[in-house]
């Protein structure tokens, strides 16, 4: 299972969902759990999403 702390550690620069998945859990091909976690973190203000580039980053 992917944790918020791990996601924040990987977001040293803006990254797309697939790039995050490959750094966090390359054996899992589905990004559903990661996307759900990212949306919860965005709602809490812990990460932000740039719609123009399609990348996630720290606020």
Regions of interest found by a model, annotated:
Residues 1-8, 31:
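Short, leucine-enriched amphipathic alpha-helices that occur as contiguous helical runs
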Residues 8-10, 55:
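Residue-level detection of beta-strand scaffold positions
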Residues 10-19:
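Short capping segments at the starts of secondary-structure elements
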Residues 21-31:
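Short helix-coil junctions and helix-kink-helix linkers
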């Amino acid at each position: 299972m992917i944790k918020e702390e791990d996601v924040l550690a990987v977001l040293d620069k803006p990254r797309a969902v697939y790039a995050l998945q490959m750094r966090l859990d390359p054996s899992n091909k589905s990004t559903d759990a990661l996307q759900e976690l990212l949306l919860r973190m965005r709602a809490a203000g812990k990460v932000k999403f740039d719609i123009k580039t399609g990348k996630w980053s720290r606020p």
